[in-house]
């Protein structure tokens, strides 16, 4: 198989790589992504390590648009293969909100506690607690050729936060098949079932040739 099979150009510079820029300044997200990928031969760089990186305004109306914009902009700037994600919480009773506005649902600056409180208030008295986390992963080569995959984790919302782990809306979200929130389950379990884990697993499978013919040891 050649790099063409993973949807990228077949020129040598567009084939496999050993260094990957993860386009996030969020330390929780960087740690989670690098732990989930867990490819021994692959080294990761965070956005905070990239001097002079431009700020990418996430003004798209879909997760895919935002992920692609981040990946392409920073790949072209850095000259590195770049992986970006955009993700958020979609609540059925709120017609998909907070959606792409998940990080800043309660306004700027982004604040997890304020966002959770706003969701709790919006859901007061509503019996349908169905929700999902959705994640779109974008991988761009240095020239800006980009591909995307997506993953989701279905679940339900609690009426109050529970648990001290995780970040974002994790203390409110109970994934299907579990009685604990994302903030209560182990990191190992979350990195197996989360929306981001599912999207990253699809990324590895779809672009295995790009990821230097290496696959992470995914949990059974």
PLM features: residue spans?
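Short hydrophobic targeting helices and cationic amphipathic motifs
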Residues: 12-15
